[in-house]
Design a protein with these regions (language model features):
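Residue microenvironments linked to proteolytic maturation
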Residues: 6, 13, 33, 69-73, ...
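Generic alpha-helical secondary structure signal
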Residues: 51-58, 110-114, 185
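Polar/acidic, low-complexity leader/linker segments enriched in S/T/G and N/D
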Residues: 1-62
Length: 186
């Protein structure tokens, strides 16, 4: 098996994207929907077994729950590092529902976040795409193993057929208004 940099994309309709608002005037903008699909061959000719997605989704959600900021970008860079000048959103939670990994992403008031917000509010259907690493079967099946999600990026043309999250405008809960925790360094 060969270890690879893996990017997967889902369209707006495929991801069943929702738009949420909360924050300024009680409204911040969120995208919510499918981030990665399991058990099906995607446009990149890869198949992510459901157990691989479940494990990767849990690991990423554990990082978020521990207080780490998981940031995403507009489009995919050619490597796994996060480029702060391209950040558009922060993933606030990830979970599994059936064979799919879902996520909720807060659109940030960065230049790239403003670009995403303007497009979404103008009716552009943006998709999302997971970015991570893993091994791919060398015998042509396209099956991925040892998958680790680094982040989920906003893209124009996702490879996963259901990765078009919806937009949400929601009000902050009292929990959201409390002091945030920073992870301690070891």
């Amino acid at each position: 098996m060969t270890s690879l940099y893996l990017r997967e994309n889902l369209t707006f309709d495929q991801a069943r994207v929702q738009v949420l608002h909360e924050g300024k005037d009680g409204k911040d903008l969120y995208m919510k929907g499918i981030c990665i699909q399991g058990g099906i061959k995607n446009a990149n000719q890869r198949v992510y077994p459901v157990q691989e997605i479940a494990k990767a989704t849990k690991t990423l959600n554990d990082q978020i729950s521990s207080g780490y900021s998981v940031l995403g970008e507009v489009d995919h860079p050619d490597d796994l590092k996060i480029n702060l000048d391209r950040v558009s959103h922060m993933i606030t939670e990830m979970w599994m529902d059936g064979p799919n990994g879902y996520g909720k992403m807060k659109i940030l008031p960065t230049p790239m976040g403003q670009l995403v917000k303007t497009m979404l509010e103008s009716g552009v259907k943006l998709g999302v795409s997971s970015r991570g690493s893993g091994n791919m079967n060398e015998y042509g099946s396209g099956e991925v193993s040892d998958f680790e999600i680094i982040t989920v990026d906003v893209v124009a043309q996702p490879s996963a057929p259901g990765a078009y999250p919806c937009l949400l405008y929601t009000s902050p809960s009292p929990r959201d208004l409390s002091t945030s925790r920073m992870p301690s360094s070891a």
